[in-house]
Amino acid sequence: MLLDENKGTSTIPEFGKIQFEGFCRFIDQGLIEELQNFPKIEDTDQEIESQLFGNKYELAEPLIKERNAVYQSLTYSSELYVPARLIQRNSRKIQKQTVLIGNLPLMNSQGTFVVNGISRIVVNQILRSPGIYYSSEPDQSGITLYTSTIISDWGGRSKLEIDGKTRIWARVSKKRKISIPILLSAMGSNLGEILDNVCYPKIFLSLLTERQEQKEYLRSKKNAILEFYKKLYCVSGDLVFSESLCKELRKKFLQQRCELGKIGRRNPNQKLNLDIPENEIFSLPQDVLAAVDYSIRVKFGMGTLDDMDHLKNRRIRSVADLLQNQFGLALGRLENAVRRTIRRATKRKCLPTPNNLVTSTPLTTTFQDFFGSHPLSQFLDQTNPLTEIVHRRKLSYLGPGGLTGRTASSRIRDIHPSHYGRICPIETSEGMNAGLVASLAIRARIGHCGSLQSPFHKISERSEEEHMVYLSSGEDEYYRIATGNYLALNQGIREEQVTPARYRQEFLAIAWEQIHFRSIFPFQYFSVGVSLIPFLEHNDANRALMGSNMQRQAVPLFQPEKCIVGTGLEGQAAPDSGSAAIATQGGRITYIDAGKITSSVDGDTVGTELVTYQRSNNNTCMHQKPRVRRGEYVKKGQILADGAATVGGELSLGKNILVAHMPWEGYNFEDAILISERLVYEDIYTSFHIERYGIVTCMTSQGPERITKEIPHLDAHLLRHLDGNGLVMLGSWVETGDVLVGKLTPQPAEESLRAPEGRLLQAIFGIQVSSARESCLRVPIGGRGRVIDVRWIHKEENFGDNAEVVHVYIFQKRKIQVGDKVAGRLGNKGIISKILPRQDMPYLQDGTSVDMVLNPLGVLSRMNVGQIFECLPGLAGNLMNRHYRITPFDERYEREASRKPVFPELYGASEQTANPWVFEPNHPGKNRLIDGRTGDTLEQPVTTGKAYMPKLIHQVDDKIHARSSGPYALVTQQPLRGKSKRGGQRVGEMEVWALEGFGVAYILQEMLTLKSDHIGARHEVLGAIITGGPIPRPGTAPESFRLLVRELRSLAPELDHAIIYENDFQIDRKEV
């Protein structure tokens, strides 16, 4: 963060900085650490020695550019070279070579990785920090148990606990525990040293069990190790001490449960007042003794328990840590490979070279597996530029070593006071992962040890100057931090006023002289997505969460538009996302076209390539449009071209729409939205989408697959777009079912003869039928569009097989339609229910028809009043051609601070445009609308204004689905669910009620039984529908009923059932 010493102001750091810093730390430190830990490798006779010199590693320039890696579906990586030395002691030969370790994926300028042509992101993980923690919990009898938990750097745990009988144990698993003297003796201490170093020896002896100080196994370390091994592994009988037993104990217990690491070493040193060097990464007897002492203090009320949800007890595992772990894993595999190669060379009595010893396969495959399958390596969400920024700044409790969505408690998911200024209290996932996937606050950063830090202005007592200081979680609790209306106070009267402040996780009101730090600005506590919501303070937090999440689902529009009412952060979000092209150097523009901008800088020519109609990971269109002119002089950092969702370098996700909050014939019931046809015909909400369809040709057991235009048994109309090579031609308009790539797959000849036409041709004419079947790539349902690109990629990775991949890109232009979803920034969302002709829409007194009609009941119950505050200045700004940038929480200056500027702006717009209806004193903020159908004025004035409404990626073209026949579940014999499985629509309880309300008994019976899960009847029903005959009546029960009977029989009752027809109910009255 940069500090302007003259004005005391600061600039917001780059939003992707957290990823760049992590990768740079891995390149500068993590690589060297792991390479220096790579051991010298010798053969069994110690005649050959191999060694790597990791501090002199080199990264070569990438062989291909990032854009070419995306185009050819390759990985954007660099070759890693390390100097190596091989010594043969018999012949005294020394060979030195620079060997290739493998390909290391590189981070691009957007903070992501391109792996196999796909952009991926590595998410930061929140883990419990290694160290010693104290807690208490009641046992089954209600007695409080005090526990000290030692968490290792590997995630293993061991506990010291004082049970209900006031005895102290070391618990190594849920069912096994050992006494403290055995553990300490096995670690090298005797009873005398233990009692000398314990602060409370009498209490310590009273907590031991069965006078253990008199036991035989405490007199020697060997006996203690044997006793510890028996207790740990439940071994009975006599054991013989050996080095292998010690080695196994060291590997299974000490390394997994006692290795604290450099970060974990600081925790016991601070908590237990120890002075142990940080390079001592294992737990020592001193640690255990100090932990026992502190447990005794906690037992008698002299110590404090730890809050495990506090951020000071957690650390961030960044991209640097994850990549370093994978690199260390790859080097371990490389070490085994080198040992095998040396062993093989020794048997053959030949001297290998360093290049022969080292192979690049372990490193390359390890990173490919990591980026392809690791839970924290995720598919980059590229719906819009904001989505990419937020994805780079995510924090996850999930993943290896973390929590799971099913086991995490509500306490962990909840907001903690230590999150203040570090983790956004609003933005999180919805559903099972609520509270487990959070977002980094806008000014937070990750410290050197993985701690989250937040900046504050330090207030000096001697001078009026303020200095910016980053405080870690836990450090700010000991200072009084002003959080309230300090900005609204004049310097002369600050000392006389009481200021809201934060101290020890509580909010207090204290004098200004007692303040140590102050917050920087109101955005400090929120994430990027939440900071883009105007009038945030007038919203319910749940609706703000929905608004921030739905901004990330907005699709870039054909004609993006800047918001009239914003927060001022839009200008930084667009450049930091990487969607806009930025000038790297100042100069004069000499050439511009759709794909390139060239500038002259001190006689040199600098070219900037633009992105034109490229597909994102979410099938949206990425495109850059130049916004500079030829001959114009640009400065360094100036915007050269806008992205798909930016205008003038500002983030632009939606459109400023004239909305009216009123009911209209029930079409906006329950959040449904009524829109004007103007939004359709004038392409207001038109978006571009690019779908990719791929097909692979490979070698089969019958021969290679072929891409060709000559496809037998297919109509020529389906093949009309193919060229001579069997690929679809660029610019072709394709419909559902058209062939994009013609492919033939060989099959055995006897399979061809099984077909009736094959046997007929061979019997009559003696013609041998083709021994290949067509397996073409076709346009799926809903995939119609224009072909804009065809990529034929050759791969030689599958064990020497020359596999070929063809990708076809189809461009779609989607107008808004009934069923699409739109939403505002304040959590107001809805589905388009009807598109009205513009002449039927309500219109203003100047004849302007309303674009969108929203339900007014959606404001009161949801408590998102911010949308009313947004639309009124939006109307004034639209009439006066102004834009407003409003900082949230402006009511810290005075009461009703958000409301007071609204009416003056409306009055100014009314005066400037000579339209008195804009501001009517009798009902300010509301207008008299006229019904477009009748021409009559509506009875009540209506709140009307300009709201910023994005169109979301949840579109009806992607979701609509119909099933005529498809797969069934094996157990219930009912149709599967989901569009991807060609499933059916579930007729649930509420749907049954709706049909019952219309009295359609026969339709209900068919839907619930015959057409659903009756195996025999559904085939008969299909035939009856085709022929127009009556629906048959089956003589057996449906499968789900039979399943229910079987489940009930498992409880041992005898159940049977019979089918009763209508004729059986014709019973004579006398019999009754």
Curated annotation (Swiss-Prot):
Chief site of localization: plastid
EC number(s) given by UniProt: 2.7.7.6
Record GO biological process: DNA-templated transcription
Substrates-to-products reaction catalysed: RNA(n) + a ribonucleoside 5'-triphosphate = RNA(n+1) + diphosphate
GO molecular function: DNA binding; DNA-directed RNA polymerase activity; ribonucleoside binding
Keywords carried by this UniProt record: Chloroplast, DNA-directed RNA polymerase, Nucleotidyltransferase, Plastid, Transcription, Transferase
Any one GO cellular component localisation term in the record: chloroplast
Domain of life: Eukaryota
Keyword Chloroplast: yes
Compartment(s) of residence: Plastid, Chloroplast
EC class name: transferase
Subunit record text: In plastids the minimal PEP RNA polymerase catalytic core is composed of four subunits: alpha, beta, beta', and beta''. When a (nuclear-encoded) sigma factor is associated with the core the holoenzyme is formed, which can initiate transcription.
Function: DNA-dependent RNA polymerase catalyzes the transcription of DNA into RNA using the four ribonucleoside triphosphates as substrates.
PANTHER family tied to this protein: DNA-DIRECTED RNA POLYMERASE I SUBUNIT 2 (PTHR20856)
Similarity field: Belongs to the RNA polymerase beta chain family.
Name assigned to this protein: DNA-directed RNA polymerase subunit beta
Species per Swiss-Prot/TrEMBL record: Cycas taitungensis
Encoding gene (name): rpoB
